[in-house]
A protein has these predicted regions:
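Divalent-cation-assisted or electrostatically stabilized phosphate/pyrophosphate-binding catalytic cores
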Residues: 116-138, 186-201
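Conserved N-terminal diphosphate/IPP-binding helix and adjacent helical/loop segment
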Residues: 1-99, 105, 109-124, 175-188
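Active-site alpha-helical segments that house and flank conserved acidic catalytic motifs
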Residues: 87-113, 164-170, 202, 206, ...
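Mid-bilayer segments of alpha-helical transmembrane spans in multi-pass integral membrane proteins
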Residues: 129, 133, 166, 170-174
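Well-ordered alpha-helical segments within folded domains of soluble proteins
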Residues: 63-69, 135-144, 203-210
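Inter-helical turn/loop segments and adjacent helix faces that build the functional surface
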Residues: 74-85, 143-162, 177-178, 182-196, ...
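Hydrophobic alpha-helical core bundles mediating ligand binding, dimerization, or RNAP-core interactions
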Residues: 13-16, 20, 52, 138-139, ...
Length: 216
């Protein structure tokens, strides 16, 4: 199955690296930070990029952005109208993958986990303060892909509203998880636990987005 999706996954990696490059350039800096003083160097910015880029480079199945692209392709094969071209769909894959990456960085901090994907967790490698700040920053980098979309203002506003709503749901799911960790004598019901998993995991794959891409 991996070989079947090789080209799609390569295109996804290209989109992710464009939004979060290992080395910055003036165009990316302007799009991400707008005007910066000359005293701000790439070394300063790397304190944000490296913890995030390092975790992404350790692997991950990329099934969230893969599903996003596959749904977009299904829409076209079914002859349905979609507000996004395939190229635009690739360009917004950071919306789901960056949220996932940021949540892993924060989750490892909150769980006091020492490893992630077989390597030291971000807060172990880079320090808690740097990892926490970088993870938070990545949540705000993702919607930059909405800013650059060539589409209607109404559709952009819809995407922004969807994105922020899903972030709120993600943090509610994490709050439920932390609550049970801090109260080991409390046992969640099946429905409660299922809801927590849905909020945390399902948030990175907004159902509304699939509906939009499939139904136009």
């Amino acid at each position: 199955m991996k070989n079947e999706f090789t080209e799609i996954l390569e295109n996804i990696e290209t989109a992710l690296r464009k939004s979060l490059p290992e080395k910055t350039n003036p165009e990316w800096q302007a799009g991400t930070f707008r005007n910066l003083s000359d005293c701000v160097t790439d070394e300063h910015i790397q304190n944000l990029i490296k913890p995030c880029r390092n975790l992404m480079d350790l692997g991950g199945k990329r099934w969230r952005p893969l599903l996003l692209v596959l749904c977009s392709e299904l829409c076209r094969e079914a002859g349905k109208n979609s507000p996004l071209s395939l190229e635009q769909t690739y360009s917004i894959t950071p919306l789901v993958e960056f949220v996932h990456t940021a949540s892993l960085i924060h989750d490892d901090i909150e769980d006091s986990a020492e490893t992630r994907r077989g390597k030291p967790a971000a807060h172990i490698s880079f320090g808690l303060d740097t990892a926490l700040n970088a993870g938070s920053w990545l949540y705000f980098v993702a919607p930059e892909t909405i800013d650059t979309l060539k589409t209607t203002v109404e559709f952009k506003n819809w995407l922004y509203a969807l994105y922020t709503q899903e972030l709120r749901r993600l943090h509610l799911g994490q709050a439920m998880d932390i609550y049970w960790h801090r109260n080991p004598n409390l046992f969640p019901s099946v429905n409660e636990y299922t809801q927590m998993v849905h909020l945390k995991t399902g948030t990175a794959i907004p159902k509304q987005t699939w509906k939009l891409l499939l139904c136009g």
